[in-house]
């Protein structure tokens, strides 16, 4: 037996010993503390130790809540391990999630009971600070019987030579001075377990000669023998609480549910699903409660420091950090997040431990709440390492864990080839270890309720996940409801992004499927149609990239992501009276604060069903009248114990607001904000926003803002006359005209320089030149300036017009290479030969001249919008799910009985610029599911789901200047066109202002028209008392009773412009 094997065996023996001590109330604290310290080093989670470690954790999960044991310590221990669940087999990871959730729930209940009696500042269950001695992880125990009682647990410098602690055992004894101990296998710098000779163990106690002692050899027990391979750990519902949108984050956490290799089976002590009813949020809350008060400041500070280090080390230890970055698990983070307790989730101490730090803040380092907060862990994302794995995990040389698919990750990061499909994709690296998860106990497959078709990896692709009906666009996360076929394209790499959330309407957790990360290095095998659910299911739509803001994914490798990986680009408009928590400041020097708001079940359901509605939480500088999102670097946010990742981007203008609906639950919701530095200069606000997708807006504009060819011709003629009068022979385009008698118009979009697909311009623009409408909407999704790329005049969404005449020209020559056409005063046009073909121009038989003679308007066949809309598919709903290019039309929803009809594909006359066909845009059911990840300003019309796009326009735009024309179209939904419940978009919260009624409103076809936000009932309390629970808590209430479109007309405000908060677009129009 070589030294490494011996080391592994000794460590496993020690873990067996700890397992026994954990069953005894008298020794539980010491044993759990030692284990917690040991788990502070990511190497603790290497596969050779997994069975033994899981054996210990099984005991902890079973006894921690019993009398005489330490629930708080047990929870921390599980949380630290859960934070590293990506390093465990899927079965183990799922167990960890469920145990964590269960203990978190119990902790929360206990906290609630004691809350009335305990002063807020006191931590109900704070492990003794001595446990912080985690700085000295090695707790010695005597080798022999390891009687806990006889040997002091606190690091005993005089420990007997034979003493051996797990910490030393596993890590080998490298003490800070790096002195090595003879015979210590781990001390060897080249030791595989000790990467780079990194003295991870520094801080570990001095070496113990006993480390090699064979005496433990016999003690090792294989758990596997105890648990038959057939016993998957998880019980089906274990983690996803169906009722939970976020399901505590565990819900979707389990990707494919393939469970770990059978051999790992640890006895399934997991509690039946029923036990885990409380969402992770509760756990987090508990943790918060438990730890928040005392150590917050300390912890947060520590965490901040850790984070810094972590970010620095990240490259070095990528994976390690990543794990927490990823937001280790929700559970863990959140809890830790919450729990600033000294030990911080991952035993802060441990994290401080040099080794830990070196490790890039091992997850334990995470412990600091803030840390967790950072976690991008996408909101509903699975607790599992959210992609923490993303990092290549070079961290440990040891066997590379097969990381769980991180479902949480919403989008694969190119850089992580390792994880890419390794997960379970049908082709994943661990493809299907056949026996890996035998389906032996089907009943307990890890499938989380969400996963429709859960299939064990072993069945390669067949149906691993239900066949996606529609390919979701890569970015679109089709959250379909109910998992019914998640629409994911089967093969496209995009699908990886698609998050087909399999949402059940009520239950928001969309399981996003990330099939396999389409990482360049890791080619994603196309998923077979059957596996539409990619391995990474991410329960929440909004998941932010899991890594800390500073870590940038290798963008070049990603497909061009929409701003938010979540799916399609969306425009964002405040909804009238939609403020749930009025702008509030944090108390000075208050490290952790809780802000509560309520969602009525009906409101929650509506939010979940409508992809165009979102609860937006953002922070902005108090002097910024535009309320542009700006997050101070020290702010961390978690909702219902689910840490959210804040996307700060490269500069302060690229910060993005958080979208919370997928981590919310019916009833009481708690936003926990952790800061490490004063943020008094900033205000926080929670508001309902309407986030129509760019595609739905396109459809709406197409229906409502199409300028008939005859009007276009009139406008062109008028331009000719005005130009002739004012500028001689300069064309409106600013280019020299052939003469004053002809205008040369480019067929290329001035934004993308590609052929225009849907020509548009601002109502006030005087030029004939158009830009591509979709490209313009995408350009203005985030903090859009809404200025015409041709003349730079303001061209607000509601003032855009689609030029049918130009569209007809584009259609006429769609299959040719021409880049320009000349238009004469009679509006006859002809293509301009490409310069390379000029020689042909002189040739009477030249193709261009021959094939394209001047064409007069009367000869043109104008594109028929209705046909196009019809071609889009059945009842174009404003919420089409954009399928991946190629996606099929999704009628999924229709089958669901939702009001939404499937949207047909929206095919623009010539495919979309990006090559995507409109149908991509249109695609998809009305999707609530669109993950609303758009930047705030995306003004998409998509808003009403149920309504056909036409209505979408109503929201259109935000702007500072009114465009009368809009009235005609956008804002006032034509009857029948209004697509969704119009939310009154109005600027910030002017609850007082009654919504105006739109001139014409469509009679109600709004399936969800009830979305009107009723402040009075909704905001039952003032905005977020920081933690003041005695104050009425605000709640969001969407009035279902309103069905009259007139009443539901949506009002838009320029995105995020408080200045217009009291003016709805109609009023702007009136002023015009």
From Swiss-Prot:
Compartment(s) where it occurs, according to its Swiss-Prot or TrEMBL record: Nucleus, Nucleoplasm; Cytoplasm
Listed name of the protein: Zinc finger MIZ domain-containing protein 1
GO MF term list: SMAD binding; transcription coactivator activity; zinc ion binding
Alphabetically ordered keywords of this record: Activator, Cytoplasm, Isopeptide bond, Metal-binding, Nucleus, Transcription, Transcription regulation, Ubl conjugation, Zinc, Zinc-finger
Disulfide bonds: none
Region annotated Disordered, chain positions: 112-141, 362-538, 875-1072
A Pfam family that the UniProt record links to this protein: Zmiz1_N
Domain notes: The C-terminal proline-rich domain possesses a significant intrinsic transcriptional activity. This activity is inhibited by the N-terminus in the full-length protein. The SP-RING-type domain mediates interaction with SMAD3 and SMAD4.
Record organism: Mus musculus (Mouse)
Effect of disrupting the coding gene: Death between 9.5-10.5 dpc. Mice are approximately half the size of wild-type littermates and display vascular and cell viability defects. Some heterozygotes also do not survive but those that do have no apparent defects.
BP term (GO), one: pyramidal neuron migration to cerebral cortex
Covalent cross-link Glycyl lysine isopeptide (Lys-Gly) (interchain with G-Cter in SUMO2) as placed by the record, residue numbers: 91, 841, 850
Gene name as annotated: Zmiz1
UniProt xrefs under PANTHER family: ZINC FINGER MIZ DOMAIN-CONTAINING PROTEIN, ZINC FINGER MIZ DOMAIN-CONTAINING PROTEIN 1
Zinc finger intervals, SP-RING-type: 734-815
Tissue and organ expression note: Expressed in brain.
Biased composition range(s): Low complexity: 128-141, 489-501, 1045-1072
InterPro entries referenced in this protein's UniProt entry, alphabetically: Zmiz1_N (IPR040797), Znf_MIZ (IPR004181), Znf_RING/FYVE/PHD (IPR013083)
One term under GO cellular component: cytoplasm
Region (Transactivation domain) residue spans: 844-1072
Residue segments, region Sufficient for transactivation activity: 1-120
Compositionally biased tracts (Pro residues): 437-446, 517-528, 875-886, 988-1001
Subunit comment: Interacts with AR, but not with ESR1, NR3C1, PGR, THRB nor VDR. Interacts with NOTCH1 and RBPJ. Interacts with SMARCA4. Interacts (via SP-RING-type domain) with SMAD3 and SMAD4 (via MH2 domain).
Domain of life, source organism: Eukaryota
This protein's record includes keyword Zinc: yes
């Amino acid at each position: 037996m070589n030294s490494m094997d011996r080391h592994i065996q000794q460590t496993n023996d020690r873990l067996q010993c700890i397992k026994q001590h954990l069953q005894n109330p008298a020794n539980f604290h010491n044993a759990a503390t030692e284990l917690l310290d040991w788990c502070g080093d990511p190497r603790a989670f290497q596969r050779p130790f997994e069975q033994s470690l899981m054996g210990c954790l099984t005991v902890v999960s079973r006894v921690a809540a019993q009398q005489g044991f330490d629930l708080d310590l047990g929870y921390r221990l599980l949380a630290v391990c859960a934070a590293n669940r990506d390093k465990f087999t899927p079965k183990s990871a799922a167990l960890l999630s469920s145990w964590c959730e269960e203990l978190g729930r119990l902790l929360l209940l206990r906290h609630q009971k004691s809350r009335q009696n305990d002063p807020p500042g006191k931590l109900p269950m704070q492990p003794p600070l001595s446990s912080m001695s985690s700085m000295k992880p090695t707790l010695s125990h005597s080798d022999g019987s390891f009687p806990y009682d006889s040997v002091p647990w606190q690091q005993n410098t005089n420990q007997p030579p034979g003493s051996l602690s797990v910490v030393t055992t596993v890590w080998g004894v490298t003490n800070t001075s790096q002195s090595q101990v003879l015979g210590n296998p781990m001390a060897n710098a080249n030791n595989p377990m000790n990467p780079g000779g990194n003295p991870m163990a520094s801080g570990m106690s001095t070496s113990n000669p006993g480390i090699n002692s064979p005496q433990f050899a016999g003690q090792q027990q294989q758990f596997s023998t105890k648990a038959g391979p057939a016993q998957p750990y998880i019980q089906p519902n274990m983690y996803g609480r169906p009722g939970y949108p976020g399901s505590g984050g565990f819900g979707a956490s389990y990707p494919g549910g393939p469970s770990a290799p059978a051999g790992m089976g640890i006895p399934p002590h997991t509690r039946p699903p029923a036990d885990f009813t409380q969402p992770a949020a509760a756990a987090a809350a508990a943790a918060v409660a438990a730890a928040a008060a005392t150590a917050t400041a300390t912890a947060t500070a520590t965490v901040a420091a850790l984070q810094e280090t972590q970010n620095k080390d990240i490259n070095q230890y990528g994976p390690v950090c990543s794990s927490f970055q990823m937001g280790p698990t929700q559970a863990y983070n959140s809890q830790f997040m919450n729990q600033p307790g000294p030990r911080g989730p991952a035993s802060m101490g441990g994290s401080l431990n040099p080794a830990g730090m070196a490790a890039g803040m091992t997850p334990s380092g995470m412990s600091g709440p803030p840390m967790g907060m950072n976690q991008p862990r996408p909101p509903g994302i699975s607790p599992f390492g959210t992609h923490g794995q993303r990092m290549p995990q070079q961290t440990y040389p040891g066997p590379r864990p097969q990381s769980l698919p991180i479902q949480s990750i919403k989008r694969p990061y190119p850089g992580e080839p390792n994880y890419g499909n390794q997960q379970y994709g049908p082709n994943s690296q661990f493809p299907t270890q056949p026996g890996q998860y035998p389906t032996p106990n089907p009943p307990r497959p890890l499938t989380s309720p969400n996963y429709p078709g859960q299939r064990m990896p072993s069945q390669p692709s067949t149906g691993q996940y239900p066949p996606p009906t529609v390919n979701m666009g890569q970015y679109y996360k089709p959250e379909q409801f109910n998992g019914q076929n998640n629409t994911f394209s089967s093969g496209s790499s995009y699908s990886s992004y698609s998050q087909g959330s399999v949402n059940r309407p009520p239950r928001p957790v969309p399981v996003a499927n990330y099939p396999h990360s389409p990482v360049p290095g890791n080619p994603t095998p196309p998923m077979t149609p059957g596996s539409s659910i990619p391995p990474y299911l991410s329960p929440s739509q909004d998941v932010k990239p899991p890594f800390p803001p500073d870590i940038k994914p290798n963008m070049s490798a990603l497909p061009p992501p929409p701003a938010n990986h979540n799916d399609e680009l969306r425009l964002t408009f405040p909804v009238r009276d939609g403020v749930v928590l009025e702008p509030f400041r944090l108390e000075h020097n208050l490290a952790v604060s809780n802000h509560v708001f309520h969602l009525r079940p009906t409101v929650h359901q509506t939010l979940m069903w409508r992809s165009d509605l979102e609860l937006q939480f953002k922070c902005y500088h108090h002097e910024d009248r535009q309320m542009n999102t700006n997050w101070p670097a020290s702010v961390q946010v978690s909702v219902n114990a689910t840490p959210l990742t804040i996307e700060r981007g490269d500069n302060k203008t690229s910060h993005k607001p958080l979208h919370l609906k997928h981590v919310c639950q019916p009833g009481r919701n708690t936003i926990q904000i952790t800061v490490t530095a004063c943020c008094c200069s900033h205000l926080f606000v929670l508001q309902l926003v309407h986030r129509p997708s760019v595609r739905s807006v396109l459809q709406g504009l197409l229906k409502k803002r199409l300028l008939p060819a005859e009007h276009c011709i009139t406008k062109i003629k008028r331009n000719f006359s005005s130009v002739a009068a004012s500028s001689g022979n300069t064309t409106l385009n600013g280019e020299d005209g052939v003469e004053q008698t002809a205008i040369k118009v480019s067929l290329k979009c001035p934004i993308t320089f590609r052929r225009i697909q849907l020509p548009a311009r601002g109502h006030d623009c005087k030029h004939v030149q158009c830009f591509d409408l979709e490209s313009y909407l995408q350009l203005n999704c985030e903090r859009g300036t809404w200025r015409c790329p041709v003349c730079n005049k303001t061209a607000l969404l509601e003032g855009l017009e689609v030029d049918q005449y130009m569209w007809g020209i584009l259609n006429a020559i769609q299959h040719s290479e021409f880049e320009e056409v000349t238009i004469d005063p009679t509006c006859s046009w002809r293509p301009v030969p490409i310069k390379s073909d000029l020689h042909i121009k002189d040739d009477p038989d030249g193709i261009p001249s021959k094939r394209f003679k001047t064409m007069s308007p009367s000869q043109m066949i104008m594109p028929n919008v209705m046909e196009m809309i019809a071609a889009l598919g059945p009842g174009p709903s404003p919420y089409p799910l954009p399928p991946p290019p190629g996606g099929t039309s999704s009628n999924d929803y229709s089958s669901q009985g939702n009001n939404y009809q499937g949207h047909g594909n929206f095919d623009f006359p010539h495919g979309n610029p990006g090559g995507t066909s409109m149908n991509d845009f249109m695609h998809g059911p009305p999707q609530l599911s669109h993950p609303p990840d758009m930047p705030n300003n995306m003004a998409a019309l998509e808003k009403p789901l149920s309504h056909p796009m036409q209505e979408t326009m109503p929201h259109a735009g935000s702007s500072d200047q009114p465009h009368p024309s809009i009235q005609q179209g956008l804002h006032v939904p034509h009857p029948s066109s209004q697509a969704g419940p119009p939310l009154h978009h109005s600027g910030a919260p002017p609850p007082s202002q009654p919504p105006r009624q739109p001139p014409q409103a469509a009679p109600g076809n709004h399936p969800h028209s009830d979305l009107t936000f009723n402040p009075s009932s909704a905001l039952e309390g003032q905005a977020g008392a920081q933690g003041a629970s005695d104050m009425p808590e605000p709640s969001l209430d969407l009035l279902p009773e309103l069905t009259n479109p007139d009443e539901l007309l949506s009002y838009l405000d320029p995105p995020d412009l408080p200045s217009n908060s009291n003016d709805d677009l109609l009023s702007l129009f009136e002023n015009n």
